[in-house]
């Protein structure tokens, strides 16, 4: 009998295939005490080592398939396996209480998970998920139980499961896995993000899919609407086959825009750039016709290792990106890291709210021994392309001045050492903090450009953690307050003959693009896979009409009014 279930649309596309149930393994165990505690500790450490080997393989495979920024989740998992704050209490529990390894692991990891989940904090929620995933793997090795392995699938299927861990998702074989559906998860969960990178249609958060589906059922997944159909009629299958064909045709049509200009119907040109994490992300940037790189996140150079990257290592990474972009602008964000990331070689304080604490430019100015090697590497690489440098989390004009002074010191040092340094490097800041937006006219006199980081600007302006379900309704990209701040920043930069870009998720949002175009945004930087859709939309719009739209939008009272207004202006685009 045909059924239809609604979930959260997580990754575009249509999948039609037989259901493959990802059965959760039996990880139950007896709570028996042990007499040989040394042997039990050895058993635990053996399971740890096997887990490290597995995760390293999965991480390397994920980097090849998805890029280093998506593989970074497994760097976090590997760090969990090295974390003495987790490992030592487990070993102590075995030795002091004669508890078996499985029970000790479960007790200690559950304590951490409970603590982290009780905090309304994005980082802590991710940390809890990391511990849960890693502990499950270690427990399976302790018990000698095999975890589900989606990579063994050898026929066209739709994966059905309670949830897909990052390691599950990274092992999906695109040749056979047509799509997946889960009980839990949201659009920003790790599995959803990875499914978009793999371009596998996905629907998450259905709550009950595993109870409704049996192995072998015919499943239709609509990753655009969040609809999941179980054993639909032949007529309905035919409709979705046509929808799938149209989806692929649309993708092919988009490819024709790869080398097209990002210009409105009335001749206004903007720049569409890509966000990247490492040089490994460059193929996607080039394939999707990016006109530059608007955000190069350098923190991935610092993660998944036990010592700070050397100046030479950083120089080679920056040089590779600049050379690959062949003279197109590359905007590099200096180190944006703090207490929310565990780096064993940095003595960072634990903070209740690391996103408002000791991080980014604050950390770099306080510890110039970390900052100077990065600045030197960037300056040395500057001769290999068109380099722009921006400082993150700048709250005051003095922070920008201090960062610029350090950079100029290192420029002078390098020239004295015989290095060549480009003399046309533009220096800018991320606008993520409301205080910076409020003083944009002051900053604009000294910086060369702004890049608006909307992910944080929205959170800080609305005082709402977007990962907290209870206040997620306040994470409103289209709120008139946000639009007014964006308008203020853009106008301040233009008054001084400077330019403004945007590198948050909002820059690639199909509802936001018409508004941003009307507000005068010069550069839109987004995930490489969003560029062609954004280009098509921009080419269908008139800048003059979008200016009128944005003028009306900033006078609205609510996000809903703004969305209705955008629909009114773009319905024929």
UniProtKB/Swiss-Prot annotation:
Pfam families given for it? PEP-utilisers_N (PF05524), PEP-utilizers (PF00391), PEP-utilizers_C (PF02896)
Question: What EC number(s) does this enzyme carry?
Answer: 2.7.3.9
Q: Does the keyword ATP-binding apply?
A: no
Gene Ontology cellular-component annotations: cytoplasm
Catalytic activity reads: L-histidyl-[protein] + phosphoenolpyruvate = N(pros)-phospho-L-histidyl-[protein] + pyruvate
* Function noted in UniProt: General (non sugar-specific) component of the phosphoenolpyruvate-dependent sugar phosphotransferase system (sugar PTS). This major carbohydrate active-transport system catalyzes the phosphorylation of incoming sugar substrates concomitantly with their translocation across the cell membrane. Enzyme I transfers the phosphoryl group from phosphoenolpyruvate (PEP) to the phosphoryl carrier protein (HPr).
Quaternary structure note: Homodimer.
Q: What is this protein called?
A: Phosphoenolpyruvate-protein phosphotransferase
What organism is this sequence from? Staphylococcus carnosus (strain TM300)
């Amino acid at each position: 009998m045909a059924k239809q279930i609604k979930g959260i649309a997580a990754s575009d596309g249509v999948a039609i295939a037989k259901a493959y149930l990802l059965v959760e393994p039996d990880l139950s165990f007896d709570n028996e005490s042990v007499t040989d505690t040394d042997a039990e500790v050895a058993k635990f450490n053996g399971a740890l080592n096997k887990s490290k080997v597995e995760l390293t393989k999965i991480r390397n495979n994920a980097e090849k398939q998805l890029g280093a920024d998506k593989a970074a989740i497994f760097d976090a998992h590997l760090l969990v396996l090295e974390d003495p704050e987790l490992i030592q209490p487990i070993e102590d529990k075995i030795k002091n209480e004669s508890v078996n390894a499985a029970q000790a692991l479960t007790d200690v990891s559950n304590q951490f998970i409970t603590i982290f989940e009780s905090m309304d904090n994005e980082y802590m929620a991710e940390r809890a998920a990391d511990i849960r995933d890693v502990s499950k793997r270690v427990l399976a090795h302790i018990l000698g139980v095999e975890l589900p392995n989606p990579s063994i699938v050898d026929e066209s299927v739709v994966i059905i499961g309670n949830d897909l861990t990052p390691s599950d998702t990274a092992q999906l074989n695109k040749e056979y896995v047509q799509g997946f559906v889960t009980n839990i998860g949201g659009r920003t969960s790790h599995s959803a993000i990875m499914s978009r990178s793999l371009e596998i249609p996905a629907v998450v958060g259905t709550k009950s899919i595993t109870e409704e589906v049996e192995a072998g059922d015919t499943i239709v997944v609509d990753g655009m609407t969040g609809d999941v159909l179980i054993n639909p009629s032949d007529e309905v299958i035919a409709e979705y086959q046509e929808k799938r064909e149209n989806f692929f045709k649309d993708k092919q049509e988009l490819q024709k825009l790869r080398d097209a200009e990002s210009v409105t119907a009335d001749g206004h040109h903007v720049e569409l750039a890509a966000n990247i994490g490492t040089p490994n992300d460059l193929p996607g940037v080039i394939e999707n016709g990016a006109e530059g790189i608007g955000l190069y996140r350098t923190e991935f150079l610092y993660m998944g290792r036990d010592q700070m990257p050397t100046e030479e290592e950083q120089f080679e990474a920056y040089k590779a990106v600049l050379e690959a972009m062949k003279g197109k602008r590359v905007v590099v964000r200096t180190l944006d890291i703090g207490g929310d990331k565990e780096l064993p070689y940095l003595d960072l304080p634990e903070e209740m709210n690391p996103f408002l604490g000791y991080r980014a430019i604050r950390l770099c100015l306080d510890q110039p021994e970390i900052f100077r090697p990065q600045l030197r590497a960037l300056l040395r690489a500057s001769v290999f392309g068109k380099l722009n440098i921006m400082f993150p989390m700048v709250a005051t004009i003095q922070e920008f001045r201090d960062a610029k002074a350090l950079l100029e010191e290192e420029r002078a040092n390098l020239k004295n050492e015989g290095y060549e340094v480009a003399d046309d490097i533009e220096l800018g800041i991320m606008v993520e903090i409301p205080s910076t937006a409020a003083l944009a006219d002051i900053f604009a006199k000294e910086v060369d450009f702004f890049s608006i980081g909307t992910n944080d600007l929205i959170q800080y302006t609305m005082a709402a953690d977007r990962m907290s379900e209870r206040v997620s309704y306040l994470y409103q990209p289209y709120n008139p307050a946000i639009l007014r701040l964006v308008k203020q920043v853009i106008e301040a930069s233009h008054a001084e003959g400077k330019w403004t870009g945007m590198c948050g998720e909002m820059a690639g949002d199909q509802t936001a693009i018409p508004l941003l175009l009307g507000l005068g945004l010069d550069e839109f930087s987004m995930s490489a896979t969003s560029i062609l859709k954004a280009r098509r939309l921009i080419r269908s719009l008139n800048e003059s009409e979008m200016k009128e739209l944005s003028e009306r939008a900033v006078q609205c009272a609510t996000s809903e009014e703004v969305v209705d207004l955008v629909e009114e202006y773009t319905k024929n685009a």
